[in-house]
């Protein structure tokens, strides 16, 4: 009878173990998929935060430039027809606006090549006309004349200021006549500070594929090779996750175009693998516990339901002993 108990218990336990293992595998698969999708969505959301930061930065400075243009255009035409009148009437407006947004430079380039310049580096003086800057050869001047909208330069190194700036320029017309080209120089450091405060390991490439803004300032080091990220992005496109190797470490990333820039977010593959492995570890422990409990319970359940068979076996043995004259007593079943 003990042999039957063991065999039945073993069969029942093997079936239960198989079912629990299958259940565990299926559960792990769906858990892994859920964690993977959740993590990727979280990283995508963080990338969108950086994208929105860049867009808001651009929108704010464009609104500033339009407001400045409007105030200049609203001046009487007599205030804009001579250099002296422009200095006296436009100069204070340029200085006021520069202070309001803490710009590096705010200026008005005239048709004769001169520029009325308000500088942060020379704040004590009122804006003055200069003719030594060769403004007509500058992109901000030429491109603004080609469009009716605001032209925005990519971040570039200003040779005079010795720092990276972003220029917003707009051609100004009054009564159908060109007054000049308005320019506003914003330090790219302002954008860097905004990006630095965004969550996640995000950064911005300029048109030359150099990082100029990042949450991790170590990435601004020009000696770092970022080609693995750029190459993976080229193969996968905007907002598509990719994997790449960096210093023998597997990493995940996603990038998207934001105007002239490329915004990216990257993380170690561990950010996905760790919670998956943790979930797998917990499920394995739970599976072992469930199998152990199942084995014990099934053994006792089988033993309980087979106990009447033991009485029947005893009764039958006694009966056959009686009819074979081996005993004079018969046990009741």
Predicted regions span which residues?
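Solvent-exposed, extracytoplasmic
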Residues: 84-100, 177, 181-219
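Extracytoplasmic/periplasmic ligand-binding sensor regions of membrane-associated signaling proteins
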Residues: 99-100, 111, 117-185, 191-194, ...
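Membrane-proximal, non-catalytic sensory/regulatory domains of signal-transducing membrane proteins
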Residues: 110, 140-173, 199-203, 207-208, ...
């Amino acid at each position: 009878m003990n042999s039957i108990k063991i065999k039945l218990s073993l069969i029942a336990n093997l079936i239960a173990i198989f079912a629990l293992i299958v259940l565990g595998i299926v559960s792990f698969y769906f858990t892994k998929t859920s964690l993977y999708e959740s993590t990727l969505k979280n990283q995508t959301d963080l990338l969108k935060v950086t994208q929105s930061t860049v867009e808001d930065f651009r929108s704010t400075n464009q609104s500033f430039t339009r407001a400045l243009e409007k105030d200049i255009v609203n001046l009487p035409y007599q205030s804009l027809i001579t250099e002296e009148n422009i200095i006296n009437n436009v100069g204070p407006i340029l200085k006021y606006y520069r202070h309001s947004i803490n710009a590096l430079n705010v200026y008005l380039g005239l048709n004769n090549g001169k520029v009325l310049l308000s500088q942060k580096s020379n704040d004590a003086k009122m804006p003055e006309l200069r003719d030594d800057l060769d403004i007509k050869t500058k992109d901000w001047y030429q491109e603004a004349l080609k469009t009716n909208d605001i032209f925005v330069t990519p971040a570039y190194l200003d040779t005079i200021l010795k720092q990276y700036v972003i220029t917003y320029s707009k051609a100004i017309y009054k009564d159908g006549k060109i007054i000049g080209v308005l320019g506003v120089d914003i330090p790219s450091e302002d954008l860097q500070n905004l990006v630095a405060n965004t969550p996640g390991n995000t950064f911005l490439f300029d048109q030359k594929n150099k990082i100029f803004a990042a949450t991790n300032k170590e990435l601004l080091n020009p000696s770092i090779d970022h080609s693995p990220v750029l190459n993976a992005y080229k193969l996968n496109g905007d907002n598509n996750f990719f994997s790449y190797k960096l210093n023998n470490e597997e990493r995940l990333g996603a990038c998207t175009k934001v105007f002239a820039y490329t915004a990216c977010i990257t993380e170690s593959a561990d950010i996905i693998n760790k919670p998956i492995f943790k979930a797998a570890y917990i499920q394995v422990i739970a599976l072992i516990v469930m199998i152990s409990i199942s084995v014990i319970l099934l053994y006792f359940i089988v033993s309980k339901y087979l106990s009447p068979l033991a009485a029947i076996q005893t009764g039958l043995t006694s009966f056959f002993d009686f009819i074979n004259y081996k005993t004079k007593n018969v046990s009741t079943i």
